[in-house]
Design a protein with these regions (language model features):
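Glycine- and hydrophobic-rich flexible loops that cap the catalytic core of alpha/beta enzyme folds
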Residues: 1-197
């Protein structure tokens, strides 16, 4: 087991795929958790903080995938929530509802943090939630009339989508705050570490 402090965005960027194992629970963060994260990000911007600690992420290389595919053992709620926030920013830009100062921000977010760059034309998403959440997450990439509104995935995505439009901070500032999220990245080494015992 190896642990090191690093930025969450480095963790996301260096992974081709982040798989939530079938034995994990469904995504269950409530809106209050998203409000807290959003408030922390805004405070990071306003206080000009160098970083904001965001907890630990425990992962192990996926034996069924490439060396850059990881099973997320602990931290799936945080990874999923940040992915929803990033997708909300990207979709707001795509929908023309916000205009970033950086004209490349949409591509930076989608290609580095949301989509597997090796297969961008096939739109292979980096995050692979468990089956109960996968459909709701996939629908967020398409027509809003097809969203699964009963899913927490969708509800929290919509919270971010709407909140960003109400704030007086720019999406560039918000993305910069996301880049300041610091994690403890704990990587398990099989067979010594059993992911199901963590």
């Amino acid at each position: 087991m190896n642990g090191q402090g690093r930025l969450l965005t480095h963790f996301l960027k260096n992974a081709d795929k982040l798989v939530i194992p079938v034995y994990q629970r469904n995504y269950d963060w409530k809106e209050e958790h998203c409000k807290k994260l959003y408030s922390d990000l805004v405070k990071t911007i306003r206080d000009n903080k160098r970083w904001h600690f965001f907890g630990g992420i425990v992962s192990v290389s996926d034996p069924m995938g490439s060396s850059s595919d990881y099973l997320v053992i602990d931290g799936q709620q945080r990874i999923t929530t940040v992915s929803l926030l990033l997708l909300a920013i990207a979709n707001l830009i795509k929908d023309g509802l916000v205009t970033p100062n950086d004209p490349n921000l949409y591509d930076v977010i989608t290609k580095k943090y949301l989509v597997d760059e090796i297969n961008p034309k096939q739109r292979k998403m980096k995050l692979k939630p468990i089956k109960g959440d996968q459909d709701a997450y996939d629908r967020l990439w398409g027509d809003p009339s097809e969203y699964n509104f009963s899913s927490r995935i969708t509800q929290n995505y919509l919270f971010f989508y709407n909140q960003i439009q109400r704030e007086d901070i720019s999406v560039d500032q918000l993305f910069t705050a996301v880049e300041k999220l610091q994690i403890i990245d704990i990587t398990l080494t099989p067979p010594d570490d059993d992911p199901q015992l963590v």
